[in-house]
Amino acid sequence: MKRTYQPKKRHRQRVHGFRKRMSTSNGRKVLARRRQKGRKVLSA
């Protein structure tokens, strides 16, 4: 059986990246929460 996680750089960025987060209002809320929490890394 193959493993379920087959990493791809492009897919990771397009689904979870900073620009994707910034492109929607809810995504911006995610970034705001992570800034407030003090996350060192905001997005993938």
Curated annotation (Swiss-Prot):
InterPro entries: Ribosomal_bL34, Ribosomal_bL34_CS. One of its GO terms (cellular component) is ribonucleoprotein complex. Coiled coil: none annotated. GO terms for biological process: translation. Residues 1-22, 30-44 have a biased composition (Basic residues). One of its GO terms (molecular function) is structural constituent of ribosome. Keywords: Ribonucleoprotein, Ribosomal protein. Residues 1-44 are annotated as: Disordered. Belongs to the bacterial ribosomal protein bL34 family. HAMAP family: Ribosomal_bL34. This is Large ribosomal subunit protein bL34.
